[in-house]
Amino acid sequence: MSASGGQVAANMPANTARRSLPWPAPAKLNLFLHILGRRADGYHELQTCFQFVDLCDEITIDVRMDGRIRRVAEIAGVAEDDDLCVRAARALQTAAACAMGGDIGVLKRIPLGGGLGGGSSDAATCLVALNHLWKLHWPVDALAALGLKLGADVPVFIRGRVAWAEGIGERLTALYPPLAPSESNYLIIKPNIGVDTAGIFQDPELTRNSAPITIHGFLASGGRNDCLSVVRRRHPEVARALDWLSGFGPARLTGTGACVFLGLESTEQGREIVGELPPALKAFLVRGMNDSPLLARLAIG
């Protein structure tokens, strides 16, 4: 199941060099989120574990020889100059002094304002794809550093591996067995609202003094989401969705929401739960992925 989204333009402009196959931009889940403190610059020190899921936006890029960067379809509520894909493309073009451009299409499946990282993932996919299509040969560390300027979540999508994250989310430790989480099935529930991340982190009642934990501690205890109490208070729709989903198991909030999720024993269990879904909620049956599908797409060129 997936949300509907924008369209990709059907016709290739005459000044376009070539059209590539679509590039996936996966959603992520925060399997836990602890906030350790606030830095002098206003950002928060945190710990989290990012895992990808197979709910993906789809990015298409037609390379242009005239240097113009253009979004070829509207995304509701997102102006072109604010679009992270466009900003990512322009940032890479400037940093690399590249004369080429691109027509960028985004087919949205990841809901906006859900805590699933859709915008950051789209930006990361654009950086990885354009680095390949423009033949820049930037190393992944350089791409991740550029991506960090666009958002704290962008580097994990560029690196493409399930990760333990610290700092503002940019200090990443890739996780491999036995430390990697299982690639479980999940049911993600989205209430019909979006959550303003900045508003949650600015709330005076936000927990900001959690003690640091280790990866082994997370694997043993599972952790929690320190944003949960503030999100519940500010957004009753999220609270109701979480309470409903918690009737089927230990439901969690991802990021600052609005999405909540539940690990499943089977896809059949997920389908049974969806059969009882209240009409105000959207459901996404997904599978956890420890390697981003973007890496597989990059491998085929």
Segments the model singles out, each with a brief description of its role:
Residues 2-114, 132-140, 178-180, 190-192:
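ATP-binding N-lobe of GHMP and related small-molecule kinases
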Residues 2-5, 9-24, 30-45, 136-250, ...:
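ATP-dependent small-molecule kinase catalytic core of the GHMP/sugar-kinase superfamily
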Residues 89-93, 131, 249, 274-277:
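Conserved hydrophobic residues forming the short capping helix/wall of the S-adenosyl-L-methionine
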Residues 113, 188, 259-261:
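Short aromatic/hydrophobic contact patches that present stacked aromatics
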Residues 114-140, 156-158:
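DPxDG-like acidic metal-binding loop motif
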Residues 118-119, 254-258:
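Glycine-rich beta-strand-to-loop/alpha-helix junction loops that act as flexible
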